Amino acid sequence: MSNKSVLLIAGEPSGDLLGAHLAQSLKSLEPNLKLAGMGGKRMREAGVEVFINADKLAVVGLLEILRQFRDIRHAMQTLKRYFKKTPPDLVVFIDYPGFNLHMAKQAKKAGIKVLYYVSPQIWAWRYGRIKKIKKYVDHMAVLFDFEEKLYQKENVPVSFVGHPLANAPTPSLSRNEICKQFNLDPDKPIVALFPGSREQEINKLLPMMVQAGKLIQTQIPTVQFILPLALNLALDKIRPFLSPEIKVIQNDISYVLAIAHAAVAASGTVTLEIALQQVPLVIIYKVAPLTFWLGKKLIRLSFIGLCNLVSPEPVAVELLQQDATPQAIADEVFQLLNNHNYRQSIIGKLGHLRPQLDRGNAAQNVAKVVHNLIFS
């Protein structure tokens, strides 16, 4: 019987989901493994003893981080105490690099092995973080093959586990059945709205999406809108921004993407999820002007959407800051719905993404890495 313990640390909804899938795979591989950590609802449901709720820690932008500093500091202090009093056999840090790289140092100080799952985007900005990774991380589990090559070049132990979204299950229901379930007409266009999972994203982006929706309706009166509610958000949080035309659902995002003709999305992992389902999309991004200015100085990338970053050529229009207006969003969605040649061109490009990212079940691949680290 194993008395080994693993700590899973996730600070955002996307990491919470990855942590939940990893927990399930670890339990299948090693049923007696003790799992605890920092996360949200999904990890809790997967059997992880979550002793730090990460819901308040999911922030975007430099200024926004300062506003949540007290909660972040409290989480750090709690983990440091845990490392000293109840050291696990391994800590798995999932994404969330600003927080997790700092805590990886604390884990190593306590003599604990460290696995980092989902690489910080050192290829985009602050490549110097590779020094911390070399010093404090025993093994990297990365989602993209180019990241594996990067770490191999730097002599960092690494496994390319594939991207979990590339192997995500598809709904068992037909398109018509899903539309019936959501009370939507399968013969009329459906646009999915993804305003993000963080409160400040919702506040900035959802009102714009709602206004864009009204403009789209003037051009396409039959259009239908659907908004999948992020697990960490209550309906009351977004209700003030909504119009009656938008149908809010609490369901697996795969059901929404199975019926959507187009999508409007905040930048982030969701853009890749949408793209992998070959749903044409437009990406919008808006943060505090100072945050954006600082980001432009630090980040050396042509694109902000993950689907554009991993594709050989851009697959989605990006509307950033002052360019993100209701009219600009409406114009692009209209093209995605009504311009047949343009639409087919985008769908064709989206079709090339999955083969690049699929390595089977990513969570099972990471679980094997965990198993090797704690039993080696």
From Swiss-Prot:
SUPFAM superfamilies recorded: UDP-Glycosyltransferase/glycogen phosphorylase
Keyword Magnesium: no
GO cellular component, as recorded: membrane
Source superkingdom: Bacteria
Pathway info: Bacterial outer membrane biogenesis; LPS lipid A biosynthesis
Catalysed transformations (reactions): a lipid X + a UDP-2-N,3-O-bis[(3R)-3-hydroxyacyl]-alpha-D-glucosamine = a lipid A disaccharide + UDP + H(+)
Keyword ATP-binding belongs to the record: no
A Pfam match: LpxB
Residue spans crossing the bilayer: none
GO terms classed as biological process: lipid A biosynthetic process
UniProt cross-references to InterPro entries, sorted A to Z: Glyco_trans_19
Molecular function GO terms recorded: lipid-A-disaccharide synthase activity; phospholipid binding
EC number(s) per entry: 2.4.1.182
Alphabetized UniProt keyword annotations: Glycosyltransferase, Lipid A biosynthesis, Lipid biosynthesis, Lipid metabolism, Transferase
Similarity comment: family membership: Belongs to the LpxB family.
NCBIfam families listed in its UniProt record: lpxB
Job of this protein: Condensation of UDP-2,3-diacylglucosamine and 2,3-diacylglucosamine-1-phosphate to form lipid A disaccharide, a precursor of lipid A, a phosphorylated glycolipid that anchors the lipopolysaccharide to the outer membrane of the cell.
Entry protein name: Lipid-A-disaccharide synthase
Annotated organism of origin: Coxiella burnetii (strain RSA 493 / Nine Mile phase I)
Lineage summary: Bacteria, Pseudomonadati, Pseudomonadota, Gammaproteobacteria, Legionellales
